[in-house]
Amino acid sequence: MELQKKFTALAQSQVELEVVVAREDAQRHYQRFVEEYLERARLPGFRKGKVPLAVLERKYGSAIRQDAAAALMEKALEEGFAQASQDSQPLPISRPSLKKKPVFDPDEDFSFAVIYDVFPSVELRNTSGFSLSVPTVSVTEEDVSRELTRIQERNALVTDKGADSCAEVGDIATVDYHEVDDSGAVRPGTERAGVVFTLGVEEGPFALGQDILGMKLGQRCLFAKRAGMLKDEAAQVRVTLKALKQRQLPSLDDELAQDVSDAFRTLDDLTRSVRQNLAEALEAALHEYKRRQLLRILVRENPFSLPESLVVGEMESRWALVMRQFGVSLSGTPQNKLQFFQQWRPEVEEHLKQRVIVELLLKQEQVSVSAEEIETEYVRIASKTGSKEERVREYYAGEEKRRALCEGIRERKLCQKLLGRCVTECGPEQSLTDFLQEQSRA
């Protein structure tokens, strides 16, 4: 098919494609299209496939021309996109929109224009020489002591509290709860039984952890809370404290160390391991902190626009995930969906821009992964997870998982290269606990 094509770059990562199909090709297309119609046509008084062309065109001519135009546009776009440059290739999630409805006349050239989204065109002008401010954090003896206490708690003996006991911080509470309406009746579908959480450590459902403190075993209380995915609905929650357990901590000694792992013979062995693990966790968190800061700077220093279909597609994926988590129909709660999209948009756009820049830098820096680096990664994963190297290799034997592994290695190598071109400045002092908690929420 003979096509005349003109690609024009527009704002917001869009392209306009103008197409002209030669009259001869349009005629041949229309003739084949009509012949297929005639083979399938059924009209009263005529056998299938025996309807005269003049009768068919008189009765359905307008509809046939519309269908023929749609089929011709689809075929022309397929050929046009196949011949388009890399910068003019449409995004898979983008559906081209007609600039205006075309008129199909088999005796004339057929022309139409569509607008569609493309991968953002980004000119990376500034990718190095940045100053990164990093908090001053270190592992203290207090941090080590706190982690040893957590180990004691994980190895504690759990026992029931007495019948007259009250809920205290550190207790393990078991509760039943349900929502009630204005008349005090149970709201159907809100009943939950046997919910367990640690007071003072976990908030629990409806953030009931603080409310339960001081309640007696078997006591029932009604609390005013906030419900809904956006916490914008008032709710009355009736709670019954069904059980209370307490932890009896073991002594911090060699015996505890040996209970934790056969690798430890003394408390000193355990303490050294704790200190090393905290140091490694801090190192990883600091690296991640610098990586995120670097990506934010790269987005700021290299501005560009995202195609709307890319942003909406990402938000739709997040919405589907939220709906599955809450067990809600995807067709419901349109108002909540709009509110979530408004809240998510800045974060989604930032995330997508970072991904675009990373993909471009991977190509620009020609980052590759060698077979030796893959083997080293297998060893690292096996050591970190306590698995055998053979099991790790088996897990990544599939093409998809192996590709994901290689992409992870490539991105780490790129990050190391980019961070090496930056200057790190020491920021304000911060405790290890606060820093790690902030990074876990980032």
Swiss-Prot record:
Q: Where in the cell is it found?
A: Cytoplasm
Q: Which domain of life is it from?
A: Bacteria
The cross-references to Gene3D superfamilies, in alphabetical order and at most eight, read: 3.10.50.40, Trigger factor ribosome-binding domain (3.30.70.1050), Trigger factor, C-terminal domain (1.10.3120.10)
Molecular functions per Gene Ontology: peptidyl-prolyl cis-trans isomerase activity; protein folding chaperone; ribosome binding
Listed GO CC annotations: cytoplasm
Gene Ontology BP, a term: 'de novo' cotranslational protein folding
Identify the Pfam families for this entry: Trigger_C, Trigger_N
Q: Does the keyword Membrane apply?
A: no
Name the SUPFAM superfamilies on file. Answer: FKBP-like (SSF54534), Triger factor/SurA peptide-binding domain-like (SSF109998), Trigger factor ribosome-binding domain (SSF102735)
Domain PPIase FKBP-type span(s) in chain numbering: 170-250
- Catalysed reactions, semicolon-separated: [protein]-peptidylproline (omega=180) = [protein]-peptidylproline (omega=0)
Record bears the keyword Cell membrane? no
Keyword tags: Cell cycle, Cell division, Chaperone, Cytoplasm, Isomerase, Rotamase
* Main location, first listed in the record: cytoplasm
Comment, domains: Consists of 3 domains; the N-terminus binds the ribosome, the middle domain has PPIase activity, while the C-terminus has intrinsic chaperone activity on its own.
What family does the entry list?
A: Belongs to the FKBP-type PPIase family. Tig subfamily.
Quote the function comment for this protein: Involved in protein export. Acts as a chaperone by maintaining the newly synthesized protein in an open conformation. Functions as a peptidyl-prolyl cis-trans isomerase.
Protein name, per record: Trigger factor
Native species: Treponema pallidum (strain Nichols)
Gene responsible for this protein: tig
